[in-house]
Swiss-Prot record:
GO terms for molecular function: proton-transporting ATP synthase activity, rotational mechanism. The keyword Endoplasmic reticulum does not apply. F(1)F(0) ATP synthase produces ATP from ADP in the presence of a proton or sodium gradient. F-type ATPases consist of two structural domains, F(1) containing the extramembraneous catalytic core and F(0) containing the membrane proton channel, linked together by a central stalk and a peripheral stalk. During catalysis, ATP synthesis in the catalytic domain of F(1) is coupled via a rotary mechanism of the central stalk subunits to proton translocation. It comes from Clostridium acetobutylicum (strain ATCC 824 / DSM 792 / JCM 1419 / IAM 19013 / LMG 5710 / NBRC 13948 / NRRL B-527 / VKM B-1787 / 2291 / W). This is ATP synthase subunit delta. The lineage of its organism: Bacteria, Bacillati, Bacillota, Clostridia, Eubacteriales.
Amino acid sequence: MYEFLDRRYALALYEVGEKNQKLEEYINDFGEIVHLLKNDENINQVVNHPQISTSEKKKIFMEIFKGKIDEKLLNFLLLLLEKKRIHDAEGILTQLNKISLEKHNKVVAEVRTVIPLTDNEKTTLASKLSAKYNKIIIFKEIIDKTIIGGVYVRVGDDVIDGTIKFKLESMKKVMLKEE
């Protein structure tokens, strides 16, 4: 929702993690915390309860997480509680992962096919995408029977749609225009 703010918080956490040489630990621990925030009924009740003060929420978080996560990450969580941004934790995690990929010159390519790509096809596609974007490619493979055949690739906002479904829809539009 507030992508710009999420990114600012994520960048701050990234820099602290990098400075303390605990970046991967922070990303993993924060990911687990976000999972808890989304799925643990008790934590949700505490976070969302209007009659529990922020200071009480902070005490509860201290009891839960102290000694289990790095102190600086705990301080970050407490800051999110204080600034009433704890509900934005998932967006912050998303931005944190994006920043990490950017800093390591990596990009995620969402690849949709009807059947899994062979290792040779993955290698070929990775080298072509890597040359185009000048980044290391990380595949996120999705099997999608609705595309009929071919390959759909999304890298950031760029889409390469080489699916049969897309080609059929394009032909249909052309044929309907001519009538």
